[in-house]
Amino acid sequence: MSVNSPVRPVMAADILARKGGEPIVCLTAYTTPMARLVDAHCDLTLVGDSLGMVVHGLPTTLGVTMEMMILHGQAVARGTSRSMLVVDMPFGSYEESPAQAFANARRLMAETGCAAVKLEGGQHMAETIRFLVARGVPVMAHIGLTPQAVNALGGYKVQGRGADAERVMEDAIAVAEAGAFSVVLEKVPDGLSQRITQRIAIPTIGIGASAHCDGQVLVLDDMLGLFADFRPKFVKRYGELGASADEAIATYAAEVRARRFPAPEHVFADELKGKAQ
């Protein structure tokens, strides 16, 4: 094989094969520059509908449209070469029927080049997952806290405590048996997440779940510390980019007002002297 041969991107079968092995690494991305950074280190790059809140300032993910997901999916695809690109199906794009879900999943895959779609829901979405998988659409499932159902759930609460644990377990079994290649467990208690991971044959990807899941996902902007006042319990900050950006912008503003920027090295001379400019 030539050393210049393109790298084969990660595929659904590769993720399935990681069950019980080295933990799977996933982060969200919404732009080309960030996608390049994520792609260098992660197995999965997720264009999450969280972009509605993170990028567009919406209060929930419910206002996210197919057009928004396609636009950001295309941008992320331009920065992705080795990780598996997964794009969220937005609220209202798949719940009506399996046929509706396939039409929109087909559009996402055709227009973004993504390798899989993610949709929220457990037992009630199993038929749709099965329908999509049978037609060549790899599906990442998402159970536990499902943000698109925030109004029905009464907020962003932990799911699966007490008697509710059986429901979440049954959701996990249902999506696995329907053919999903992995499942996100969001805000599911540690012990239950471990039991689900042991019980089902597909990889579990935790977010606010357990270190014993088969992998982890975080929202990139959260783990980079871009939002000063948003500190959910399940997010570890690996950087403080918000503070760094604030300092840089403040310094720029001060230097412009003091006429210290642009300095001589940042401007062009009226006449060429020596090297061409």
Curated annotation (Swiss-Prot):
Official protein name in the record: 3-methyl-2-oxobutanoate hydroxymethyltransferase
Molecular function GO labels: 3-methyl-2-oxobutanoate hydroxymethyltransferase activity; magnesium ion binding
Residues engaged in binding 3-methyl-2-oxobutanoate: 49-50, 88, 118
Keyword tags: Cytoplasm, Magnesium, Metal-binding, Pantothenate biosynthesis, Transferase
Enzyme class per UniProt: transferase
Summary of subunit composition and partner proteins: Homodecamer; pentamer of dimers.
Chief subcellular location: cytoplasm
